[in-house]
């Protein structure tokens, strides 16, 4: 059965992502590829700082939950085929067919071509493609985590998944330092969006813990404590789950 609250979390987070990237082009930090500040006092930067720590993490949590729901009805082979055709193939083709154009404009705006006049054309094309990677990094990581998930399922035989159904509010609160620690691991040095540690943790927590209805029910009862404790995905999951907020959306 399709879970409406998961769809609501997803589309609202996507809206935040779009807003974030629109405002990011005018951030006051002066990051390469952006246009730059519009005014002396950049009030809109507050929105960037407010949502950046958690909104992509939340999407990976939801993706992990969705993976579990899919695997409840399909085999691992069907899951891998679906994820490969829907994630890996489009992200690879799109990177070199379309997104090099975005990379070109990013590098043009940031003045990168001025220092790369001696770079061979084929190498420059690859650099432009990865500079314009845009949202493709998300689905690339999602495919990697999906493949790892199948390996985990083969070894664990759902024993860990069944154990995680017992997670109560104190256990959920203890996930805060887990997420913080994961954020320090497996971060790529150049293309910084590839943060395997924190996003992988979010994906597997979504699969193992937050896909349980029993856990979400406990989370609903303790949502105020969660909100006061930290801004981790479980808080937002609870907030989005409240019937008074989302019913009928």
How should each PLM-predicted stretch be described?
Residues 1-179, 187-191, 239-247:
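Membrane-cytosol interface segments of multi-pass membrane proteins
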Residues 4, 8-11, 196-199, 225:
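Alpha-helical transmembrane segments of integral membrane proteins
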Residues 66-69, 150, 200-215:
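Transmembrane alpha-helices and membrane-interface helical segments
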Residues 75-81, 210-221:
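Hydrophobic, small-residue-rich membrane helices and short re-entrant helix-turn-helix hairpins
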Residues 90-95, 207-217, 233:
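Juxtamembrane membrane-interface segments at transmembrane alpha-helix termini
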Residues 109-122, 190-211, 224, 233:
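Alpha-helical transmembrane segments of multi-pass integral membrane proteins
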Residues 182-187, 212-215:
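Transmembrane helix-loop junctions in multi-pass membrane proteins
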Residues 217-249:
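Alpha-helical transmembrane segments and terminal signal-anchor/GPI-anchor hydrophobic tails
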């Amino acid at each position: 059965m399709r879970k409406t609250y998961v769809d609501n979390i997803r589309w609202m987070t996507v809206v935040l992502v779009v807003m974030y990237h629109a405002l990011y082009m005018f951030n006051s930090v002066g990051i390469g590829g952006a246009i730059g500040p519009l005014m002396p006092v950049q009030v809109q930067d507050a929105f960037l700082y407010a949502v950046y720590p958690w909104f992509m993490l939340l999407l990976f949590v939801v993706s992990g939950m969705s993976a579990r729901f899919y695997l409840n009805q399909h085999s691992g082979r069907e899951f891998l085929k679906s994820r490969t055709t829907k994630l890996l193939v489009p992200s690879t083709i799109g990177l070199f067919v379309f997104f090099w154009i975005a990379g070109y404009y990013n590098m043009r705006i940031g003045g990168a071509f001025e220092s790369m006049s001696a770079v061979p054309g084929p190498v420059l094309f690859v650099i432009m493609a990865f500079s314009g990677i845009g949202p493709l990094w998300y689905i690339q990581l999602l495919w990697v985590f999906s493949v790892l998930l199948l390996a985990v399922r083969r070894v664990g035989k759902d024993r860990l998944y069944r154990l995680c159904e017992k997670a109560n509010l104190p256990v959920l609160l203890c996930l805060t330092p887990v997420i913080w620690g994961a954020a320090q691991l497996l971060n790529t040095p150049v293309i910084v969006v590839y943060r395997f540690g924190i996003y992988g943790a979010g994906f597997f927590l979504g699969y193992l813990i937050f896909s349980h209805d029993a856990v979400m029910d406990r989370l609903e009862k303790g949502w105020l404590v969660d909100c006061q404790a930290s801004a981790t995905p479980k808080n937002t999951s609870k907030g989005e789950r409240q019937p008074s907020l989302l019913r009928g959306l």
